[in-house]
Regions:
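Small-residue-rich transmembrane alpha-helical segments that form helix-helix packing/gating elements
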Residues: 1-66, 71-216
Length: 219
């Protein structure tokens, strides 16, 4: 069964790659719609997956190493987003907000570890219930302070606007090839997720710290 499913997955991946990179023959757009819309949907899904990976990577690493069921993880990310907005508005630099927010949220995580998780080591149900409560309290406090409206941290000039990706989106009647244009900030998000994923892989498999982490997971 496994070779059959592997072959099916390989063929499906080949078809998707062909649909993305190859010029579509006449008549295919009548079946699937415009290729530009198809490509935007594909890249939008990849971008969303990259964002989910950034959020989930920390949760899985913490749970895998320390067996902490931290369901307040998402609220901590949300708090980091709000703090990043406030700091970038105050300082005028979105780049400065990154290390400051990192330190603040990391300190909050250390406090949770020492004051909450250490007292409930190995008690998954209690950790689940307590962290759900912490998540609800944090979410309500943020809703009270920042309200329900959305906030935007504007991208720097070098990430604003669309960027051209070497993927053919259409071919005009004159034979001119039109390449896909996609928001540069979303491309940066995909590369950031890829970089973090590769960095975590190398950290866990090629360094002494990674050896300690893997040993902690196994034992």
């Amino acid at each position: 069964r496994r070779p059959i499913w592997s072959l099916i997955i390989l063929l499906a991946a080949a078809v998707v790659l062909w649909l993305i990179f190859a010029p579509w023959p006449p008549g295919l757009e009548e079946v699937l719609g415009r290729k530009r819309i198809f490509l935007n949907a594909i890249f939008g899904g990849v971008t969303l997956g990259a964002l989910y990976f950034l959020v989930a990577s920390g949760f899985t690493l913490i749970f895998g190493l320390m067996r902490n069921v931290n369901l307040a993880h998402g609220s901590l990310y949300l708090l980091g987003g709000y703090l990043g907005f406030e700091i970038s508005e105050f300082t005028g630099s979105w780049l400065l907000a990154f290390p400051i927010v990192f330190v603040i949220v990391a300190l909050l995580g250390i406090v949770l570890q020492h004051q909450v998780f250490r007292r409930m080591d190995g008690e998954d149900l209690r950790q689940t219930m307590v962290t759900i409560g912490i998540s609800v309290v944090l979410a309500d406090l943020m809703l009270w302070y920042w309200g329900g409206q959305s906030y935007t941290i504007f991208a720097p000039d070098w990430l604003s606007g669309p960027a051209t990706i070497p993927v053919i989106s259409s071919i005009r009647d004159t034979g001119e090839i039109v390449y896909l244009r996609y928001p540069a900030v979303r491309i940066a998000l995909m590369f950031a997720a890829l970089g973090i994923g590769v960095g975590m892989l190398l950290l866990l498999n090629t360094t002494r710290l990674g050896m300690f982490v893997r040993a902690g997971v196994d034992d």
